[in-house]
């Protein structure tokens, strides 16, 4: 069931589902997303967990903050949310930007367990071939228009991009 709470003047929309006696789980979506993005995860957890699925400020049905917020302000808000509802040691599930929040909150000792889903702030291990591909294209992007002219250079880049896949 979707609910709203006011935290230090910031309204926060959230969905509370699952087993009220289960371990609390706080779901945090990625940047530019909303709570529906991770609702499929909530459904899996609901039978045994007490799930709080947040619409982070400026996303979904939660209004934007009055000032510019960074990662730490969002993390503070998640902690205030948990404190106001007497949630202790929740399991944090963070997708993308939500994963970055989970990392910050974990570093504060807020939670003893977390699950990161494609989390921002974690650099994936890459093979040398990846870097060769990326930096070759970046170099070609600057050089080909100079060598071939803008139009022919752009066509060559488009053809290369089509073969490379992105």
Task: Outline where the language-model segments fall.
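N-terminal cap/lid segment of alpha/beta-hydrolase-fold proteins
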Residues: 1-11
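Conserved HGGG/HGGXW glycine-rich cap/lid loop of the alpha/beta-hydrolase fold
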Residues: 10, 15-61
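Active-site loop/oxyanion-hole signature of alpha/beta-hydrolase fold enzymes
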Residues: 15, 53-93
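Structural signature of beta-strand start/N-cap positions in the alpha/beta core
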Residues: 24, 50, 88-91, 112-113
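Conserved catalytic-core motifs of eukaryotic protein kinase domains, centered on the activation segment
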Residues: 37-39, 62-68, 125-128
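Gly/Ala-rich beta-loop-alpha elbow adjacent to hydrolase catalytic centers
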Residues: 94-98, 102
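Flexible "cap/lid" loop of the alpha/beta hydrolase fold
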Residues: 103-143
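Hydrophobic, aromatic-rich cap/lid helix
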Residues: 153-166
């Amino acid at each position: 069931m979707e609910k709203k709470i006011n935290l230090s003047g910031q309204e926060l929309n959230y969905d509370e589902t699952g087993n009220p006696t289960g371990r609390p789980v706080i779901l945090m979506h990625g940047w530019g997303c909303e709570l529906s993005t991770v609702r499929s995860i909530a459904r899996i957890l609901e039978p045994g967990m007490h799930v709080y699925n947040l619409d982070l400020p400026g996303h979904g049905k939660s209004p934007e903050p009055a000032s510019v917020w960074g990662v730490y302000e969002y993390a503070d808000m998640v902690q205030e949310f948990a404190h106001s509802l007497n949630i202790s040691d929740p399991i944090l599930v963070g997708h993308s930007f939500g994963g970055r929040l989970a990392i910050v909150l974990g570093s504060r000792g807020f939670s003893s367990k977390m699950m990161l889903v494609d989390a921002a702030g974690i650099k994936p291990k890459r093979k040398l071939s990846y870097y060769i591909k990326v930096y070759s294209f970046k170099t070609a992007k600057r050089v080909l228009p100079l060598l071939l002219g803008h139009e022919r250079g752009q066509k060559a880049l488009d053809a290369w991009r089509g073969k490379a896949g992105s």
